[in-house]
Every structure is written in structure tokens, then in C-alpha cells.
Regions:
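Short, well-ordered beta-strand elements within core beta-sheets of diverse protein domains
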Residues: 14-19, 34-40, 126, 239-242, ...
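Structural signal for hydrophobic packing residues in well-ordered secondary-structure cores
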Residues: 35, 39, 54-61, 65, ...
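ALDH superfamily catalytic-core signature
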Residues: 13, 174, 213-354, 417
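Residue-level signal for inorganic ion chemistry
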Residues: 10, 31, 46, 68, ...
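Rossmann-like NAD(P) dinucleotide-binding subdomain of oxidoreductase/dehydrogenase enzymes
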Residues: 106-248, 374
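Residues at or immediately preceding the N-termini of alpha-helices
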Residues: 7, 21-24, 43, 61, ...
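Conserved C-terminal structural/oligomerization subdomain of aldehyde/semialdehyde dehydrogenase
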Residues: 9-15, 203, 240, 294, ...
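N-terminal Rossmann-like NAD(P)+-binding subdomain of aldehyde/semialdehyde dehydrogenases
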Residues: 1-112
Length: 460
């Protein structure tokens, strides 16, 4: 049995039956037969249904946003934005899949014509997390389905209601009934049944968004089965603030990037590396901003920070903070578990952070910001890259050329200048090092799960 819990009250929401091996096998079989027919559907027909799906998301936006906030605790305003962004990615691939998948022609030797085609791969398993329960799914599923594939979704158990709602959306939009199928697996059966799904011959690709540990496990299983995989894993994104930056604007962007989704995002700002000449000013303004953030019921207007999604996540985050303070970090605000119900954790600011402290380079999944002082640009780059992760990064400077020179040295999948990191359907998204491999979104993302077929022939 799967039980979902309201993180704002710690009270149960609903119970769902966990699927058995036989039920999972049946779901894969039904999805496979729908894929066989779907792969032959012309792109304009696929696009029509994807457009209809985007429209449904917008029509039903309020009810889906409320479910997101109820199950994982993000403020309702942010949940509404998540549903809208999910509709946006559906629109994007409905409008651009044809150009992304357009065959590429070449003239070869001896009058031979070469054509590169992008054909459907098969069923793709999506293993998705709870922190953006709609966006993470649509970011993966929209391009895969437009490419002609079928989807098996294994969502995080604490957002099972969202998984069911998304499955119904695909059916209501007119997609084949089992082309997109969600499987619901109990926590104590995840390893066994996930392995079973990966090994199933109908599954030809795996996309995981999750922890580095989960990525290692899935990569091992995928590699053993010789199946392609895309991994979007953890991050410890550095935000570098140079001495010529607009400090007030930098603080606004940095705080927003740290507190969005109550800090529970792989591309949230984690480490703020600030030039020594402006460190005290940045620290003072950042403290004011963190202290002014409103924490509370995610359904109340004006709330910026809701609860963390689960009790164990709060315990883990608090442990990282207390260990770092014991190692010498200065706690400027927050850092205590509040009394009362729910899994709340206050905005927390740590300064004087240095190497060997846990928060120096590790991923902190919650509203905890760490300040690290750098003497110059070179040291800022060294600190930024001194982490196992390489997902996102940002540089704040009044000199674009200087900022771009630093961006070129950062080991990250993306870098934003004078703004917070965010994903965009038009740009590839993914990381390096222990943040994973492969790309989502844009033309690069839709081509991750296709058969890139070379065709060579002479006209007769």
C-alpha cells in the first residue's frame, strides 16, 4: 500500500494499492502495443494531440496545482507556474518536433545520397522525483512521445496522486489509452521492480531525475541491459558574485534562486561565492532577505516557503547544518526545527563556510544558503569547481566580458549571467560530473531517445 502525506500537517492524504510484478508486466505489454501503432502516426497528428494536452493542462490548472501543493508542499503560486510551464513544453514540442526530427541529407561519393533519419526507439522508462511532480514528467514525456515512443512512468510514491492525474490527462487529450502508463510501486519494492522494468525487452531507454546514488544504481542496471539512459542528478550550483556586480540585484536573484520550491531543486543556488571587497555588503543584504521570507501554509497568499516534502528530508538537511556549524560555520539565521505540525524548515544562512565543511560542496535540499568568500576571480572559479557536481552556475558582474570569461571556466551544464538558473524548452538541460549525463529539452533532448538511422542509396 502507498500512503501519501500532506507535508504541511503530517496527516495522510490518500492510500493507493501498490502494483505487483504481474500488473507491471501487463502495463508494459499494453503500452508496447499502443506504441506499435503510435510510431506510425504522422507528426501532425501527434502534434494535434500534444496541443490538446497543453490546452487541458491550462483548463485544469487550478486543480492540478492544488494537488501538487497538497502532496509535496510548494506554495500554490509556484504550483500554478509549474503547471503552466508543463503546458508550455507540450506546446514547444508540438510546434518544433517536426524540425527537430527532420531528416538530414548529404551527398556522398559516387553519386550516393546519404540520409540521417530519427526514428522511434520504443518504450522509455521515466523515473521521476517529487519536487516538480508535473514539470519533471512533461519535460521528459513530451519530447519522447512526439518522437514516436511510448512511456512507462515510475513516479515518486509521495506524489502518486499527481502521477495518476497526469496519466488521466494523456487519456483525456486523446492519446492511446496505454501509450503513457504510470506504475505505482511501494518503497520496499522499488529496487526489484525497477530492475525488472529496465530488463524488460520492450523498454529501450531510461530517463532518471533523482539523486546521484539513484543515478548510479540505474546506470548500472541500464548498462548491464545495454540500454541508453539519460541521468539528471544532484547539483551544488555555485553563484559567483564579483566586486563590480549590482549587489542589490544580485541578492534578489540569489535569494530567489535559493528559496524557490523551498530550496528543493537540483538547480537551486546552493553556494554563494562572493568577492572579498563586497562580501560584507552581500552578507548583510542576504541576511535581511532570508529573514523576511514568509514561511507557512502553501495555500495561503504571500507564503514564499512551504514545508519540506518529507520528514526524513528535513532531518537530513538539519544534520548538514548542525554538522557544519560544529565545524565552524557561522549561523546567521534559521538552523532550528520549528515547533508544530508539518515538515517546515526556516530560511537558514551560513557564513564563513570553508573547505571540509559538509555544506561547502555537498547538495543541500532545502532553504539553506552558504556564503563563501573569494579573494579574486581565479579563486572564485576554483571554489566553484571544487565539488563533485556540475549542473548549473551563475555569475554576477557589471562587466559582461569578465563574466563570460569566468563562465567559460566553470564545470557545469549551464551558466547564467546576472540571473538565476532555470530550464527552458528551447535550450538543452543537463549536467556533467556527478550531476549526470545526456540532455533534456530542445532538439538535443528529443534526440536522446531515437534511433539515429543512416540510409545510403543511389537513385535508379
Amino acid at each position: 500500500m502507498i500512503i501519501t502525506v500532506n507535508p504541511a500537517t503530517a496527516e495522510p492524504i490518500a492510500e493507493y494499492p501498490a502494483m505487483t510484478s504481474g500488473e507491471v508486466r501487463e502495463a508494459i505489454t499494453l503500452s508496447y502495443w499502443d506504441f506499435i501503432a503510435w510510431r506510425e502516426r504522422p507528426l501532425p497528428e501527434r502534434a494535434m494531440l500534444m496541443k490538446r494536452l497543453a490546452k487541458l493542462l491550462r483548463i485544469e490548472k487550478e486543480q492540478h496545482a492544488a494537488l501538487i501543493s497538497l502532496e509535496m508542499g510548494k506554495p500554490l503560486s509556484q504550483a500554478l507556474a509549474e503547471v503552466e510551464k508543463s503546458a508550455l513544453v507540450c506546446d514547444y514540442y508540438a510546434e518544433h518536433a517536426a524540425s527537430c526530427l527532420k531528416p538530414e541529407e548529404s551527398k556522398l561519393d559516387g553519386g550516393v545520397r546519404g540520409v540521417v533519419k530519427f526514428e522511434p526507439l520504443g518504450l522509455v522508462l521515466g523515473i521521476m522525483p517529487w519536487n516538480f511532480p508535473f514539470w519533471q514528467v512533461f519535460r521528459f514525456a513530451a519530447p519522447a512521445i512526439m518522437a514516436g515512443n511510448g512511456i512507462i512512468l515510475k513516479h515518486s510514491p509521495n506524489v502518486t496522486g499527481s502521477a495518476i492525474a497526469i496519466e488521466q490527462l494523456f487519456r483525456d487529450a486523446g492519446f492511446p489509452s496505454h501509450l503513457y502508463s504510470a506504475v505505482h510501486i511501494a518503497l520496499d519494492d522499488v529496487d526489484r521492480l525497477t530492475g525488472f522494468i529496465i530488463e524488460h525487452p520492450a523498454i529501450q531507454g531510461i530517463s532518471l531525475t533523482g539523486s546521484t546514488a539513484a543515478g548510479r544504481a540505474v546506470a548500472a542496471k541500464s548498462g548491464k541491459a545495454l540500454k541508453t539512459s539519460v541521468l539528471e542528478l544532484g547539483g551544488s550550483d555555485p553563484y559567483i558574485v564579483l566586486d563590480d556586480a549590482d549587489i542589490s540585484q544580485a541578492v534578489d536573484s540569489c535569494a530567489a534562486a535559493r528559496l524557490l520550491n523551498s530550496g528543493q531543486s537540483c538547480i537551486a543556488a546552493k553556494r554563494f561565492i562572493v568577492h572579498a571587497r563586497v562580501f560584507e555588503q552581500f552578507e548583510r543584504l542576504m541576511l535581511q532577505r532570508m529573514q523576511s521570507a514568509v514561511m507557512g501554509d502553501p495555500f495561503e497568499k504571500g507564503v514564499e516557503i512551504g514545508p519540506l516534502a518529507r520528514h526524513d528530508l528535513r532531518e537530513q538537511l538539519h544534520g548538514q547544518v548542525t554538522r557544519s556549524v560544529a565545524e565552524g560555520a557561522r549561523l546567521l539565521c534559521g538552523g532550528t526545527i520549528p515547533e508544530g505540525q508539518g515538515f517546515f524548515y526556516p530560511p537558514t544562512l551560513l557564513s564563513g563556510v570553508h573547505k571540509w565543511m559538509e555544506v561547502y560542496s555537498a547538495e543541500t535540499f532545502g532553504p539553506v544558503a552558504t556564503l563563501i568568500e573569494a579573494r579574486d576571480d581565479s579563486e572564485a572559479v576554483l571554489i566553484a569547481n571544487d565539488t563533485p557536481y556540475g549542473l548549473g552556475s551563475a555569475v554576477f558582474s557589471g562587466n559582461t566580458e569578465r563574466a563570460l570569461a569566468i563562465a567559460d571556466q566553470l564545470d557545469a551544464g549551464c551558466c547564467f549571467i546576472n540571473s538565476m538558473v532555470k530550464s527552458d524548452p528551447r535550450m538543452p538541460f543537463g549536467g556533467v560530473k556527478q550531476s549526470g549525463y545526456g540532455r533534456e529539452l530542445s532538439s538535443y533532448g528529443i534526440r536522446e531517445f531515437v534511433n539515429i538511422k543512416s540510409l545510403c542509396y543511389k537513385e535508379r
